[in-house]
Amino acid sequence: MSFVFQAEVRSDLGKGASRRLRHADQVPAIIYGAGKEAQSITVDHKKFIIAQEKPEFYESVLTLVINGEEVNVKVKAIQRHPVKPKLVHLDFVRV
């Protein structure tokens, strides 16, 4: 099964900007690895909540479409809210 998600580059960084994204049903994330510079992005919360329920989500190579460019990544870390069923932050590593 292949997973393809839309993502947007984010320019506003920091605690306040991340909170605003979470209130807008977006999840702040970062992509790093493969000898390239780290890139801060945002992804849709609802799509990731649904996808992460499947076991193959954690094993598969995911495709993130960022500004029309496809980037193959794997999930490295997921930070979850301690009480609510929400994702707080995602870390991806380039493949």
Swiss-Prot record:
Key word RNA-binding present: yes
Keyword terms of this UniProt record: Ribonucleoprotein, Ribosomal protein, RNA-binding, rRNA-binding
One Pfam match: Ribosomal_L25p
GO cellular component annotations of the record: cytosolic large ribosomal subunit
Gene Ontology terms, MF aspect: 5S rRNA binding; structural constituent of ribosome
InterPro entries named among the record's database cross-references: Rbsml_bL25/Gln-tRNA_synth_N, Ribosomal_bL25/Gln-tRNA_synth, Ribosomal_bL25_long, Ribosomal_bL25_short, Ribosomal_L25_dom, Ribosomal_uL5_bac-type
Gene3D superfamilies: Ribosomal Protein L25, Chain P (2.40.240.10)
Superkingdom classification of source: Bacteria
Biological process annotations from GO: translation
UniProt keyword Ribosomal protein, yes or no: yes
PANTHER family cross-referenced by the UniProt entry: RIBOSOMAL PROTEIN L25/GLN-TRNA SYNTHETASE, ANTI-CODON-BINDING DOMAIN-CONTAINING PROTEIN, RIBOSOMAL PROTEIN L25_GLN-TRNA SYNTHETASE, ANTI-CODON-BINDING DOMAIN-CONTAINING PROTEIN
Family: Belongs to the bacterial ribosomal protein bL25 family.
Subunit (UniProt): Part of the 50S ribosomal subunit; part of the 5S rRNA/L5/L18/L25 subcomplex. Contacts the 5S rRNA. Binds to the 5S rRNA independently of L5 and L18.
Function: This is one of the proteins that binds to the 5S RNA in the ribosome where it forms part of the central protuberance.
UniProt-recorded name of the protein: Large ribosomal subunit protein bL25
Gene name, Swiss-Prot/TrEMBL: rplY
